[in-house]
Amino acid sequence: MARAVAGFGDWKRVGRRFNDLMKTFLWVALAIAAASAKLEGVSEAYPRTSPGDLELKTLPAARWMRTESSKDYFAGDNGLFMKLFRYIDSNKIPMTAPVEAGITPGTMVFYMDDASAKRADLAETPQVKLSSVPERRVAAIGIRGSYSRENYDEGLAELRAWLAKRTDVKAAGEPYAVYWNSPFVPFFFKQSEVHIPVVPTK
């Protein structure tokens, strides 16, 4: 009998631990959802290309914040995001979407919102450069899934094959990645794109 009572006590402790873990999980899930909603409610510089779609589209003229690294973009410690985040945080510039990334060498671009693009008080730093870019024409493929090199490479291969069959435009620059979602979004909801700059075929 004593052994049975002791066993029952063990199960009660396991049950309490399970309940505590579930409460912790729910709080973490709520915190992530709240942070995600806050970061997802940003202005977007141009329309998204839906996952699985391939298209030509025109990107509007814009004001950029850009930083670079000597490392490949997919190196885990390239530090690109934090350089730009510290700049917008210290200058009270709203976060926008998307984030654009060159691969080798690693580069990252944040877009300025319309109000920030008109500010005269913003200055470059050794790590963050500012520039105005004209309207651009790109070939684009939409991707759903994690922001991995594998997904980027697969999307790029499909986009290049699609572009090679066209007779109206040709590649005119290096491909780059386009990321739409915050880090808090689950990988199966994340949307990204690969772009290749294009010009009309003469």
Which residues does each predicted region cover?
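Extreme N-terminal basic, low-complexity initiation segments
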Residues: 2-7
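A solvent-exposed interaction/effector surface
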Residues: 11-202
